[in-house]
């Protein structure tokens, strides 16, 4: 039985990946999930798998070398899938040090512990071991307003926020380990994810939640910044396929081919909520474009992201299966069915943060 060590598995993408892997492999694999359970980590995301005999949760910070070394010492880890990261640009602008510590130092700890566990006396590595570092397209910077411009694996790094700079630094550490030690690893750089379990500081769940509660829908700047949207289950599938079929030491871009302006996303959510809510639901009456409120633009706000997933399609056969219209309906339906989840995660610290970011502007 292959054993996976998943970091940040209680977060949005990590928990969706764990669900995907158990749906696909069931009892053929074992997953150890390491998460510090900071504000965006939520064990409710994993209540459907927590009683499985082949699932283990360990509360630990990836910066804690002793805790991570202990996991490797007590388990024969075959694969590391490294999601754990601070990931919200707005928070990075307010508290950049936290992002450097988790994203850079934490990745260094994970690499060192995996290397120590997997390296043989002659400097080679045990057969079948692999470290997959999950990163972002934001490391590439911003694209011009040109529909023919895309990020490729060869695009030079040009990060513009503390978040993207910290992720670029972590990518470079992984590249250095691959080059220096021939460490068995891959890097994936993905576009914006959306889907179930996403913490509502991110655009899509924020807009869904605010619209359902009749609150303003904040839009940075002119709302014309473009992002490429990737349904999270498609991303989970891509990560699994890179683990199984990806060439060692390679980077693969994972994009959704769903490029849309932020304001367009908001209009689509409003229209979809209107379509999906029954006329008898009193919330339907107040969900309209009047809720849209333009706020001061984010510092260093990149204008356009768009990924060309040509390499992963050609080498591995992965491509995004979920178009945005389908994905947003599935996402909204999930939030309809899990309103208790949303209510739980939007209380306390989140509400304080939301007020600081949007209500005071």
Where are these regions (language model features)?
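N-terminal Rossmann-like NAD(P)+-binding domain of SDR-like oxidoreductases, especially those catalyzing
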Residues: 1-193, 243, 272, 338, ...
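C-terminal substrate-binding subdomain of Rossmann-fold SDR/epimerase-dehydratase oxidoreductases
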Residues: 16-20, 24-25, 31, 60, ...
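Residues at alpha-helix caps and immediate loop-helix transition turns in enzyme cores, especially N-
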Residues: 17, 42-45, 95, 199-203, ...
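Tryptophan-centric aromatic hotspots in well-structured domains and transmembrane helices
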Residues: 39, 88, 99, 151, ...
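Loop/helix-junction capping segments adjacent to catalytic residues or to phosphate/diphosphate-binding pockets
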Residues: 40, 65, 197, 263, ...
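A glycine/serine/threonine-rich, flexible loop-to-helix segment
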Residues: 49, 147, 200-208
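Residue-level recognition of oxygen-bearing side chains
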Residues: 67, 98, 105, 199-203, ...
């Amino acid at each position: 039985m292959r054993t996976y060590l998943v970091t940040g598995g209680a977060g949005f993408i990590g928990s969706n990946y764990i669900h995907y892997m158990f749906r696909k492999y069931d009892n053929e694999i074992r997953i150890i999930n390491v998460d510090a359970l900071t504000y965006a980590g939520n064990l409710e995301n994993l209540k459907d798998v927590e009683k499985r005999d082949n699932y283990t949760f360990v509360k630990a910070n990836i910066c804690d070398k002793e805790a991570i070394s202990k996991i490797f010492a007590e388990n024969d880890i075959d694969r590391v899938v490294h999601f754990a990261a601070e990931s919200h640009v707005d928070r990075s602008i307010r508290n950049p040090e936290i992002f450097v510590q988790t994203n850079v130092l934490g990745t260094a700890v994970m690499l060192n512990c995996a290397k120590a566990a997997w390296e043989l006396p002659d400097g080679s590595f045990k057969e079948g071991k692999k470290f997959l570092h999950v990163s972002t397209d934001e490391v590439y910077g911003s694209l011009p307003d040109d529909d023919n411009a895309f990020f490729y694996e060869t695009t030079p790094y040009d990060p513009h926020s503390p978040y993207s700079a910290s992720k670029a630094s972590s990518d470079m550490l992984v590249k250095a380990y691959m080059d220096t030690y021939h460490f068995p690893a891959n890097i994936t750089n993905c576009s914006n994810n959306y889907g179930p379990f996403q913490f509502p500081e991110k655009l899509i769940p924020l807009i869904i939640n605010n619209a359902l509660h009749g609150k303003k829908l904040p839009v940075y700047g002119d709302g014309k910044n473009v992002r490429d949207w990737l349904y999270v289950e498609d991303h989970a599938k891509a990560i699994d396929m890179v683990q199984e079929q990806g060439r060692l030491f390679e980077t693969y871009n994972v994009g959704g081919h769903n490029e849309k302006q932020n304001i367009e996303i908001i209009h689509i959510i409003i229209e979809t909520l209107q379509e999906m809510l029954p006329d008898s639901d009193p919330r339907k009456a107040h969900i309209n474009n009047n809720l849209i409120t333009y706020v001061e633009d984010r510092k260093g706000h990149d204008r356009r992201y768009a990924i060309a997933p040509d390499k992963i399609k050609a080498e591995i056969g992965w491509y995004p299966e979920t178009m945005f219209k389908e994905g947003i309906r599935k996402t909204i339906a999930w939030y309809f069915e899990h309103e208790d989840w949303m209510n739980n995660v939007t209380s306390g610290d989140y509400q304080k943060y939301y007020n600081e970011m949007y209500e005071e502007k």
